From Swiss-Prot:
Segments of this protein annotated with the region Disordered: 9-36
UniProt keyword annotations, A-Z: Cytoplasm, Phosphoprotein, TPR repeat, Ubl conjugation pathway
Gene symbol of the encoding locus: FBXO9
Chief place of localization: cytoplasm
Functional pathway: Protein modification; protein ubiquitination
InterPro entries with a match to the protein in the record: F-box-like_dom_sf, F-box_dom, Hrt3/FBXO9_C, MIT_dom_sf
PROSITE patterns: FBOX
GO MF annotation, one: ubiquitin-like ligase-substrate adaptor activity
GO cellular component: cytoplasm; cytosol; SCF ubiquitin ligase complex; ubiquitin ligase complex
Record SUPFAM superfamilies: F-box domain, MIT domain
Stated name of the protein: F-box only protein 9
Swiss-Prot/TrEMBL GO biological process terms: fat cell differentiation; innate immune response; proteasome-mediated ubiquitin-dependent protein catabolic process; protein K48-linked ubiquitination; protein ubiquitination; regulation of TOR signaling; SCF-dependent proteasomal ubiquitin-dependent protein catabolic process
Biased composition (Acidic residues): 26-35
Keyword Cytoplasm carried by entry: yes
Length: 447
């Protein structure tokens, strides 16, 4: 076996080699590329994470679940935003369908309205309570504007003064309106103010058709000013309440008094329907019992001059209402009389009327005049009616509730009066007002 000889360098040479390696490493670090710097940064991050895992109280499961939880949280947030947008879109669609159903119902298309109602409630069951809408004053603008504008309300309060300021003066004569198009005919603006106001009194007429006056005020600014003339509204109030409305307090204007103070309405008729069941005649068959359903109507029509008409009949309103336009009706069973309004201390307005059957002059019967031995005792029969005036729903002063009904018979020979009071039970159903356009179709006399 050959001998192995180990040769070791001297100690000084070894130290010199180590020093040269260190200097070479420092030079290499100074000359590192960006890729190597990134690698070193990743290595440092790995070492820090490794040291954190070795720390007590930290498990590998927590470290594995941390990125999963972050990803799950971001997904849940995204899904929640998407769900919220879907709910909002669904509610908007349900609101649109519900408003469409309201419009169809107002137009009389009930089947179409039910279809839209069903679709809206399938999307959002409580959509009816999530819609904030208000009616216009005349109740015809359904489906158009559902949110009130307070700024417009404040402007409407000063509309009269605003229109008065906008009027122009030409040749020292007040021009209420201007022709829109040039014409060779005489325009209504040429008429004097007094003549125009007289025409407006014909529009109101003796029937107190203030509804037509309000519609006339929508033509132009000048007509609006004429329709707000205090004298017209004062005459209307005097015709309704007489001497009891001399003072304007607590109202600010005659127009406000006419609109707010309780009164009966003249442009229609109050109608009630009563239904009951009674037993019929007995038949030979013991297993059959006849029952009859009885229906009849009551009609009450008031006039501005204090007259009133009342009719009880089984005929339906379609055939009776046209006959009640004037007091000169040919219906035999009609009762005519007078009424008055009474406002008690309890702030309840009541209507009291005394009505009698229409008197008819019968020709004398000469056939059996010599055979009559006992003279017929002549008597006058009248009915006293008491009603309480109320408001129901969106309409004002459209309901009459029975509070009194009695029959008074006065014998002419003795002057005695027999009174029979009727019990107010469920057979006396309330009367509700129904406006009739034909009652104010034309005017007979001015206000």
């Amino acid at each position: 076996m050959p001998d192995i000889i180990w040769v070791f360098p001297p100690q000084a040479e070894a130290e010199e080699d180590c020093h040269s390696d260190t200097v070479r490493a420092d030079d290499d670090e100074e000359n590192e590329s960006p890729a190597e710097t990134d690698l070193q940064a990743q290595l440092q991050m790995f070492r820090a994470q490794w040291m954190f895992e070795l720390a007590p109280g930290v498990s590998s499961s927590n470290l594995e679940n941390r990125p999963c939880r972050a990803a799950r949280g971001s997904l849940q947030k995204t899904s929640a935003d998407t769900k919220g947008k879907q709910e909002q879109a669904k509610e908007e669609k349900a609101r649109e369908l519900f408003l469409k159903a309201v419009e169809e119902e107002q137009n009389g298309a009930l089947y179409e309205a039910i279809k839209f109602y069903r679709r809206a409630m399938q999307l959002v069951p409580d959509i009816e309570f999530k819609i904030t809408y208000t009616r216009s004053p005349d109740g015809d603008g359904v489906g158009n504007s559902y949110i009130e504008d307070n700024d417009d309300d404040s402007k409407m309060a000063d509309l009269l003064s605003y229109f008065q300021q906008q009027l122009t003066f030409q040749e020292s004569v007040l021009k209420l309106c201007q022709p829109e198009l040039e014409s060779s005919q005489i325009h209504i603006s040429v008429l004097p103010m007094e003549v125009l106001m007289y025409i407006f009194r014909w529009v109101v007429s003796s029937d107190l058709d203030l509804r037509s006056l309000e519609q006339l005020s929508l033509v132009c600014r000048g007509f609006y000013i004429c329709a707000r003339d205090p004298e017209i509204w004062r005459l209307a109030c005097l015709k309704v309440w007489g001497r009891s409305c001399i003072k304007l307090v607590p109202y600010t204007s005659w127009r406000e008094m006419f609109l707010e103070r309780p009164r009966v309405r003249f442009d229609g008729v109050y109608i009630s329907k009563t239904t009951y069941i009674r037993q019929g005649e007995q038949s030979l068959d013991g297993f059959y019992r006849a029952w009859h359903q009885v229906e009849y109507y009551r009609y009450i029509r008031f006039f501005p001059d204090g007259h009133v008409m009342m009719l009880t009949t089984p005929e339906e309103p379609q055939s009776i209402v046209p006959r009640l336009r004037t007091r000169n009706t040919r219906t035999d069973a009609i009762l005519l009389g007078h009424y008055r309004l009474s406002q008690d201390t309890d702030n309840q307005t009541k209507v009291f009327a005394v009505i009698t059957k229409k008197k008819e002059e019968k020709p004398l019967d000469y056939k059996y005049r010599y055979f009559r031995r006992v003279p017929v005792q002549e008597a006058d029969q009248s009915f006293h009616v008491g009603l309480q005036l109320c408001s129901s729903g969106h309409q004002r002063f459209n309901k009459l509730i029975w509070i009194h009904h009695s029959c008074h018979i006065t014998y002419k020979s003795t002057g005695e009066t027999a009174v029979s009071a009727f019990e107010i039970d469920k057979m006396y159903t309330p009367l509700f007002f129904a406006r009739v356009r034909s009652y104010t179709a034309f005017s007979e006399r001015p206000l």
